[in-house]
């Protein structure tokens, strides 16, 4: 997950480690997973996985009905909450702003091949599996 990628259109070819940006985003208690996309793209985007129990408790306090990870992550108010959290992370990386994001509609799972044995996201697997979501951000 820490493999550096090039952001030539953003930074004049400077290599940036996506894990730095991802870790910054994951300081939010609401965000469990952040996969930053930027290789050969005009701007940075991210796939976000929520911290289900914490977001679920937040949603219950806001009277947001939900029964599954999917319908919680698809809820507009939850997406607004996550965007606010991304904006907070963006304040710390002024030249590397996440401009768009999409919510993962299921938790990443080691058994599905999404995570390593140490529970780290497998970037290439996730980028292949969620390529439709990624392409949607760059249309």
For each predicted feature, which ranges?
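General small-molecule cofactor/ligand-binding pocket signal
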Residues: 101-104
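A short N-terminal helical cap/helix-turn-helix that marks the beginning
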Residues: 90, 130-139
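Short capping micro-motif at the N-terminus of alpha-helices
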Residues: 18, 123-124
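AMP-binding/adenylate-forming catalytic core of the ANL superfamily
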Residues: 1-96, 107-112
């Amino acid at each position: 997950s820490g493999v550096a990628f090039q952001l030539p259109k953003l930074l004049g070819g400077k290599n940036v480690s996506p894990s730095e940006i991802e870790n910054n985003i994951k300081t939010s208690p609401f965000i469990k997973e952040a996969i930053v996309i930027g290789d050969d793209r005009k701007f940075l985007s991210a796939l976000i996985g929520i911290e289900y129990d914490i977001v679920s408790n937040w949603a219950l306090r806001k009277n947001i009905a939900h029964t599954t990870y999917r319908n919680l992550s698809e809820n507009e108010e939850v997406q607004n909450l996550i965007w606010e959290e991304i904006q907070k992370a963006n304040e710390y990386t002024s030249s590397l702003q996440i401009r768009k994001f999409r919510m993962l509609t299921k938790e990443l799972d080691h058994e599905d091949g999404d995570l390593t044995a140490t529970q780290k996201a497998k970037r290439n697997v996730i980028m292949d599996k969620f390529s439709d979501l990624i392409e949607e951000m760059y249309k």
